């Protein structure tokens, strides 16, 4: 194989198109002399990271989006024609190829990771080599973890094809144990070789993954595998490509403890300052947070153990995914023009996906009435003057919206009375924030990183694995809540409250074995469809039946099954009976 870009041959397997992510310098270097310098290594590994942002360009097809809308604490929402949002909540489909872009993007990342892993041994600097190798192994583990949680059995590819003929042979689906064994091996090696530096002293630059990321991800993988599949330990792949060992809870607990004690990560003092609505520009006009510390900016946040970096580089012609498109999708649907958004300040315009279930609010209030995180996490639009139900034909509306990942506005002009006259669609376009050079586009101007794993999650995972209350009570103490004795109920509630709307709930209810019950609990909730009051009802076969039929796994794109000539097998529960036609009123 002569050129690094020859990895495109393997991408034939997954109908990938990566040209805009590849650079001229890639095509001019061969695997015989590349990478050599630290700059080369960073460039190669940056190509792996780039696929994270590529998937955000079609965020509605990602595992994170599914994890939010399929779980019990949010509905699908969107407008009456946004069926792809509503089907996620009801575990139905409109297009059997819905997740093609996500499948392609994740395998694109895996292919790039495989190429990097095969060539990073050429980097002379041992510290940099180990860091880059550890980052790449962790990224590959993350890609496979999302795929296996979303689709179940998928092809496991960990080497680079040596010729086009080899690349064109579609690999069969691997067993669940083989996939998890490979994930475990990648994370174990990453933890062993990556420098144990304070998160602020990253070897390769801000936003890169660390030893601590690998330890945290190992905890997440272990909890899902052992919980969902009823196992005691995580299988471990040997050097010969066969399962030859395992990782038990003691080793995982030790890894999480290492992250807690030695990473330098910690909790910020005020939960509100984790979220962009406490930024210095918006904060001065938002009474709820006037006494809160300023937003802890991306790259400076001690709770960010793993975050996908976004930036102002997003553009329609090239890199849409550098914009955090979740903030657009999860924002409040067109609401009667700028005057109405002033009343909803500082929360801006978007597509109305993921209205919050009223049962989350009620159950949270009943279980923890003095928890300030509830108001810090949820906007009650019904208490806002002039709130419009049914704006732009919003479906499955509850009047409740999450406040963590949402378009966030700022005042542009003030009237003679000091009130807001006009708004910036995003606070990041204010000259008081990023300067005069920023373009204003309500769909693209979302330059906030996507948190994947927060330090609070690490504390809660450690409590769950060790069945001790220390980590859980540290999280509660930050919220001003009293300590509690460890129990399964207390731990599950704490995860639900602390990590609400951060992409963890779907995996949690699946691995705890409560998904059918939790999903059915949505029935009877008060909602509005196009402004008309009704209640949440079963669609298709219904929540419980659909989960029982699918176990929460999504359909493999039919185009991939066809491309494989039947080597790939479709997941159960995704025949024509699961097609969503229209909302059952």
Predicted regions and their residues:
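A glycine-rich, coil/turn loop motif that links secondary-structure elements
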Residues: 128-134, 200-213, 274, 488
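Short edge-strand/loop segments of extracellular domains
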Residues: 160-165, 258, 474-481
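Long, intrinsically disordered, low-complexity segments
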Residues: 17-18, 106-109, 182-184, 205-206, ...
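Bacterial Sec-dependent N-terminal signal peptides
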Residues: 3-4, 9-39, 141, 183, ...
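Conserved, well-structured interaction surfaces
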Residues: 37-56, 79-151, 167-203, 422-450, ...
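An aromatic- and glycine-enriched ligand-binding surface/loop that stacks and positions planar moieties
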Residues: 18-82, 188-189, 208-215, 220-401
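Flexible, polar/acidic helix-loop-strand segments at domain edges
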Residues: 355-453
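Short coil/turn linking the two alpha-helices of tandem helical-hairpin repeats
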Residues: 148-149, 155, 198, 221-233, ...
């Amino acid at each position: 194989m002569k050129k690094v870009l020859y990895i495109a041959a393997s991408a034939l397997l997954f109908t990938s198109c990566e040209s805009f992510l590849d650079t001229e310098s890639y095509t001019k270097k061969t695997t015989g002399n590349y990478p050599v310098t630290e700059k080369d290594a960073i460039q190669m590994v940056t190509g792996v990271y780039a696929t994270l942002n590529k998937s955000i360009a079609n965020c509605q097809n990602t595992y994170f989006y599914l994890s939010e809308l399929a779980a019990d604490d949010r509905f699908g929402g969107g407008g009456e024609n946004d069926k792809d949002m509503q089907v996620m909540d009801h575990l139905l489909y409109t297009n059997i190829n819905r997740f093609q872009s996500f499948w392609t993007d994740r395998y694109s990342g895996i292919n790039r990771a495989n190429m990097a892993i095969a060539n990073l041994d050429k980097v002379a600097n041992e510290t940099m080599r180990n860091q880059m190798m550890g980052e790449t192994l962790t990224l590959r583990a993350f890609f496979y973890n999302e795929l296996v949680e979303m689709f179940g059995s998928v092809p496991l590819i960990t080497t680079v094809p040596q010729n086009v003929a080899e690349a064109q042979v579609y690999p069969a689906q691997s067993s669940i144990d083989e996939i998890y064994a490979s994930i475990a091996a990648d994370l174990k090696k990453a933890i062993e070789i990556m420098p144990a530096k304070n998160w602020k002293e990253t070897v390769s630059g801000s936003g890169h993954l660390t030893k601590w990321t690998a330890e945290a991800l190992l905890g997440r993988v272990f909890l899902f595998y052992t919980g969902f599949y009823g196992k005691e330990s995580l299988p471990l792949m040997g050097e010969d490509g066969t399962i030859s060992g395992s990782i038990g809870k003691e080793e995982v607990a030790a890894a999480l403890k290492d992250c807690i004690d030695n990473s330098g990560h910690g909790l910020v003092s005020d939960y509100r300052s984790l979220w962009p609505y406490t930024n210095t520009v918006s904060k001065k006009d938002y009474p709820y947070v006037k006494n809160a510390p300023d937003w802890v900016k991306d790259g400076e946040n001690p709770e960010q153990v793993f975050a996908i970096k976004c930036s102002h580089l997003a553009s329609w012609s090239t890199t849409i995914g550098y914009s955090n498109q979740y903030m657009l999708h999860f924002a409040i649907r067109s609401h009667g023009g700028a005057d109405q958004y002033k009343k909803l300040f500082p929360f801006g315009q978007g597509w109305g996906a993921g209205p919050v279930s009223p049962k989350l609010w009620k159950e949270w209030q009943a279980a923890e009435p003095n928890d300030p995180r509830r108001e810090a996490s949820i906007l009650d639009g019904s208490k806002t003057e002039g709130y419009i139900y049914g704006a732009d034909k919003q479906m499955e509306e509850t009047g409740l919206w999450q406040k963590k990942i949402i378009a966030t506005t700022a005042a542009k002009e003030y009237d003679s009375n000091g009130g807001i006259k006009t708004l910036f669609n995003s606070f990041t376009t204010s000259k008081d924030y990023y300067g005069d050079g920023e373009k204003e586009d309500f769909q693209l101007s979302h330059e906030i990183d996507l948190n994947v794993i927060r330090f609070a999650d690490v504390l809660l995972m450690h409590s769950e694995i060790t069945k001790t209350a220390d980590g859980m009570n540290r999280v509660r103490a930050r919220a001003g809540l009293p300590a509690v004795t460890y129990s399964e109920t207390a731990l599950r509630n704490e995860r639900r409250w602390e990590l609400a709307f951060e992409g963890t709930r779907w995996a949690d209810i699946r691995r705890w074995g409560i998904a059918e019950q939790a999903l059915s609990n949505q029935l009877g909730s008060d909602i509005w469809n196009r402004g008309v009051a009704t209640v949440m009802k079963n669609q298709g076969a219904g929540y419980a039946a659909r989960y029982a039929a699918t176990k929460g796994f999504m359909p493999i794109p039919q185009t991939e099954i066809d491309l494989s000539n039947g080597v790939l097998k479709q997941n159960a529960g995704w025949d024509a009976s699961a097609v969503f036609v229209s909302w059952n009123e």
